[in-house]
Amino acid sequence: AKIRMDDCVMCGHCTAVCPKNAVTISGYDTEQIEKKEKVRLNPSDVLDVIRFRRSIRRFQRKDVPSEVIGQILEAGRLTHTAKNMQDVSFVVLKKEITRIESMAVKLFKIIKPLADLFWPMARNTKIDDHFFFFHAPVVIVILAKEKTNGILAAQNMEFAAEANDLGVLFSGFFTTT
């Protein structure tokens, strides 16, 4: 076999699937791809998590430990992306939630009259001071060049949050540049 490093995107797939463990990538952390043991989720449990998922708009006012936030971010980081783009990044807001939400609410209150003209649903939308984050103790903003990649990461992150007994709200404000 000939190695073509110019075509390698350092995804680790070749190492993960080689039945003889003959392929290694210099400088690649194989811990990310080595299966320790076969782990299978109970299909009915997975379907129940999906079936009974509800958006949370009344969050408990309790701190989310850094380790839990780390697990949620790791679930997003490990998400597959189209063409191995790996274009997803995350911004965690804790202390700045109120300030950032306040700025966004001010902007939305300015543009709402225009939105009311073109978007019927906007007419029934009330914008209060906590319109975006609903007093959530932590906000994770997901950034991705390819919107689908961000959505996939958000879904995996929701599963990690659910596993930690946390509620999730997808704000639903997607933008493109």
Q: How should these model regions be labeled?
A:
Residues 1-177:
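Acidic, surface-exposed loops and disordered segments
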